[in-house]
Curated annotation (Swiss-Prot):
Belongs to the MurCDEF family. Pfam families: Mur_ligase, Mur_ligase_C, Mur_ligase_M. It is an enzyme of class 6 (ligase). Pathway: Cell wall biogenesis; peptidoglycan biosynthesis. ATP binds at residues 120-126. The keyword Cell wall biogenesis/degradation applies. This is UDP-N-acetylmuramate--L-alanine ligase. InterPro entries: Mur-like_cat_sf, Mur_ligase_C, Mur_ligase_C_dom_sf, Mur_ligase_cen, Mur_ligase_N, MurCDEF_pg_biosynth, UDP-N-AcMur_Ala_ligase_MurC. Keywords: ATP-binding, Cell cycle, Cell division, Cell shape, Cell wall biogenesis/degradation, Cytoplasm, Ligase, Nucleotide-binding, Peptidoglycan synthesis. SUPFAM superfamilies: MurCD N-terminal domain, MurD-like peptide ligases, catalytic domain, MurD-like peptide ligases, peptide-binding domain. It comes from the Bacteria. Its EC number is 6.3.2.8. It catalyses: UDP-N-acetyl-alpha-D-muramate + L-alanine + ATP = UDP-N-acetyl-alpha-D-muramoyl-L-alanine + ADP + phosphate + H(+).
Amino acid sequence: MLLLELKKINQTLETIHFIGIGGVGMSGIAEILHNLGYKVQGSDLVENYNTKRLESYGIKIFLGHVPQNITNVSYVVISSAINPDNPEIQEALERKIPIIRRAEMLAELMRLKCSVAVSGSHGKTTTTSLVACLFEAAGLCPTVINGGIINNRSTNAYLGSSNYLIAEADESDATFIHIPSTIAIITNIDPEHLDYYKDFATLISAFRSFIINLPFYGFAVCCIDHKIVRKLVDDITERKIVTYGIDSADAHIIAFNINTDIASSTFDVKISLPNVLGTTIIEKITIPIPGRHNILNSLAAIAVGIELDFGIKAIKNGFNNFKGVKRRFTKVAEYNMASIIDDYAHHPEEIKATLATAKNIANKQNGKVIAIFQPHRYSRMQHLFDDFMLCFADADILYITDIYAAGENPIEGITGQSLVDKITKNKYHDQANFLATLDDAVGVIIDNAVSGDVIIMMGAGNISSFANELPKKFGNL
């Protein structure tokens, strides 16, 4: 779709239909288009938080995918998660209704603004949210399209009044390299989405294109604590790159004097920008979220703020006003004075970061870490099986459920039980257990939780809904 076409859509008569509108990325774009005045509707298999939110704005939502849903639509938007044999896609093809990919529609929205695109294997959603908070503190009300619910706004997308747009750029299918951004952030690069890229080198090459495609006046912000990102940065001379880290003494922006607890992280920052003489120290920056990985995420936001001259006061105020992101180390309940945390971690690197944060907190409270993990997708487990065996070291007690399929067919030999068996056989963890059902987690918590413990419920499936229902379940005992 050309930019002129987006502008020429008749906002009164022409309807844009989203297939899978309940997805985080799709719902965000639908909301922005609705707020811009376009006529939007969509369908999804089940009702969820996002569909309910969109309905409350007056957007028509169909439950189920049937050809009749697109009877009077002019454009259809799909994501890579939608199968080509979807009946609504087939109907659109039959009727020659233009089918637009989610990333293409995002690109059209970004072309209208000066855009910040946040990508990387992990940390995109939190980083996007932190960047947005700094823009707002600087008096620039940005348009934001995020991959998770921003607690400050109770939504993952909102329309701003300034000429800036901040978006999470999904790297899963390489469409992110076509996003017309002015500022690009790369948090890290791990071997994910290899079902699409086929090999790690191709994925790394896509991130290189993500930077090279920036305009000459733009810049990239990259975490060189991650060795793959460091190598990528070292090989690029065509674009300006600002680096950050905790362990990298040569980074332009470095965090030190770090202290974390269950609710926040405090640290100092040293800034030594390229082509700028001298260094600047910012003392006692506080972010209301724990964890070393979140400090790194905040450094990316600081890099953008410093480059755009937001000022130290705006940076500190922006972080002070940040209320976190749904499902990112979110405390949902307490039992026997033990904290129960809901977290989206579903990749081995994310799990390690989340458990390291939990371990640090539990140690300060003389408690232990109880991890309850629901694997997500058979294909991910198959590709990263060896990494999954090694990522739970910081859990004192580990429970693993069966795999949440997310629409995939089972793969022989790839199960939650097989992961537990291999972990136990190889002595990677001496208290790894298989959890037959999520309901059994209630008994696990009752039997094991004591004061000071941190109970982490992790995964990208329905474990979050279960975790949020725990207060009710405990109340019914």
